[in-house]
Amino acid sequence: PPPPPPPAPPPPPPPPPRPGPPRLFAVPGGVPPNAVGVMGCRIIQSPRERLIAILTNALVPCNGRFPTLIALISMFFVLVEGPVGSLAGAAMMLGLIVLCVGVTLGCSRLLSATVLKGVPSALALELPPFRRPKVGQVLIRSVLDRTLFVLGRAVTVAAPAGLVIWLLANLRVGDTQLLRLLADTLEPAGRFLGMDGVILLAFILGFPANEIVLPIMLMTYLSQGTLVEVQGLDSLRALLVANGWTLTTAACVALFSLFHWPCSTTTLTVYKETHSLKWTAVAVLLPTLTGVTLCALVSALSRLLGA
């Protein structure tokens, strides 16, 4: 019989996929609570790039920081009313978000070139088969597996922190609140960053949630024992100006609101995802050092110009 034909040569290997920027998926994921963005980094297959995305996630402003930013822009930087003022305020907010994205990408690049070196990987995002969603099952899984899970982490830190804030606001040494004494202690550090001790203390005590930073400031300025709310931006601006706020103060508060340590829920989520105290500390220190550097530069420039 004739000899069998030679086996066909194997097909050439497919070309390697072009490396993509998987870290960008964490940028929009941090606009809701940053904890959601940290959990969303699970889709990144490369452990190195997943870690970079987790570490830089807090540089993206979560929804808890937007009320403070909008109030500051409206009170100190928008000088006209009507559609022109609204457009100017929106442009300033967009500029701050672009700044956050730029800093996030810059820090990611820095981490990739230093402590987390490696070869960029490709991102393959598989699409599941399309089918009609089961609304009831989606709601149940969302509430049980996600909403209650994140809220449980928040309560474990927020409840003790709320008790600490209440004690500091209601316990007094003589006629002075403990809250005010701590603010006076932090005054030199706050002035170095273009703020004051009350603002710096509010950010520290706002660790459970970024939404309570501004109410803590007002509570300390007014020497109240509970969180307070001022009706109207005009009244709020008058109160802040009476306590020494300037354009430099507002700019530094806006920058530090963008770049400071993540909230308690995000910090706990980072630890759960990385299982490392070292990387959790890096995730806290990276945005904090960024904010301290920017605020110190703005404050120094303001003093140099005599503003």
Give the positions of each predicted feature.
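Extended, low-charge hydrophobic alpha-helical regions
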Residues: 1-5, 10, 17, 22, ...
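Selected transmembrane alpha-helices and immediately adjacent juxtamembrane segments
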Residues: 1, 5-8, 89-203, 281-307
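Transmembrane helix-loop junctions at the membrane interface of multipass transporters and ion channels
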Residues: 42-45, 59, 66-91, 265-276, ...
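Alpha-helix capping and helix-loop boundary segments enriched in small/acidic/polar residues
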Residues: 26, 46, 60, 85-86, ...
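Residue-level signal for pocket-adjacent positions within structured domains
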Residues: 14, 39, 54-55, 61, ...
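Interfacial loop-to-helix junctions that mark the boundaries of transmembrane helices
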Residues: 83-96, 235-246
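Membrane-embedded alpha-helical segments of transport systems
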Residues: 31-36, 56-73, 91-104, 208-214, ...
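Conserved, well-folded catalytic cores of nucleic-acid-processing
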Residues: 16, 31-34, 47, 66, ...
